[in-house]
Amino acid sequence: MLQRMDLPVREKLPHTIPQWVADGSWFFITINCVPPGKNQLCLTPGAHGVTRPTVGDAVLAAMKFNHERFIWHCRLCLLMPDHLHAIIAFPREPGMATCVKNWKKFVAGKHGVDWQRDFFDHRLRDHHELQEKTSYILMNPVRKGLCERPQDWLWVYRPNDRRPPHW
């Protein structure tokens, strides 16, 4: 008979920006859908019976909405079928956790995306890390065999219009 092993409970990440981190610092974030592997974000019109504007279009529009209203500053957002990667600067108040939570709640309620409860974040400490994560994000669909070149991938929001505001 197999014994049940108690797995460690993963700590909930605080997603707070420490006071010593400069305003306008970039964060690499990953938000996963559940269940893993199910394409919720990258369906195209005509595929799988999709006839309306796609969820992916709506997710990127919601990202753009928050960017244009200074809720956050998005440098790059790329959708994969079951997750997204983004590089975003957040205001200290209401902060990263609240901004992401509210955005996920809106997208889930309006467009039916099933998000994983939490998300991953990593502060990008210098220009080298920023370039490294930008390349990683843009190459993700190529590595997964979804397109041949990064510029062929449709599901990208990259405004590159200004530096993060000083909130």
Predicted features along the sequence, with ranges:
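Short catalytic/metal-binding and nucleic-acid-binding patches
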Residues: 1-167
